[in-house]
């Protein structure tokens, strides 16, 4: 398609390719900045992209205060009605009874 002697379709395609390349370069630059900010150790050391999201998705703990370790909790009788494991995840909070 030509408009006033210019190939409009070719220009649009070129612009589309350039915008994709630029957005990819911007994403890479942001990832490198985040890697530098997150990585421990030397300033020039970059963290691997796989290590950028190492936050655990869920943590388990005892529902009853007084028990300090999970090992102590597991030494008890698992069929005891007062033993519960409390689970915290992303936007979740629930308790599960070990007898269920």
Swiss-Prot record:
Superkingdom of origin organism: Bacteria
Keywords: Plasmid
Comp. bias intervals (Basic and acidic residues): 69-78
UniProt-annotated stretches for the region Disordered: 31-54, 59-78
Other information: Transgenic plants containing rolA display an abnormal phenotype.
UniProt name for this protein: Protein RolA
Protein's organism: Rhizobium rhizogenes (Agrobacterium rhizogenes)
């Amino acid at each position: 398609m030509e408009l006033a002697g210019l190939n409009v379709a070719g220009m649009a395609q070129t612009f589309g390719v350039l915008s994709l390349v630029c957005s990819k370069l911007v994403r890479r630059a942001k990832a490198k900045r985040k890697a530098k900010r997150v990585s421990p150790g030397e300033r020039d050391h970059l963290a691997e992209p796989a290590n950028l999201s190492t936050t655990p998705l869920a943590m388990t703990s005892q529902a009853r205060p007084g028990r300090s370790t999970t090992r102590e909790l597991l030494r008890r009788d698992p069929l005891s009605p007062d033993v519960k494991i409390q689970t915290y995840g992303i936007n979740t909070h629930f308790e599960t009874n070990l007898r269920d």
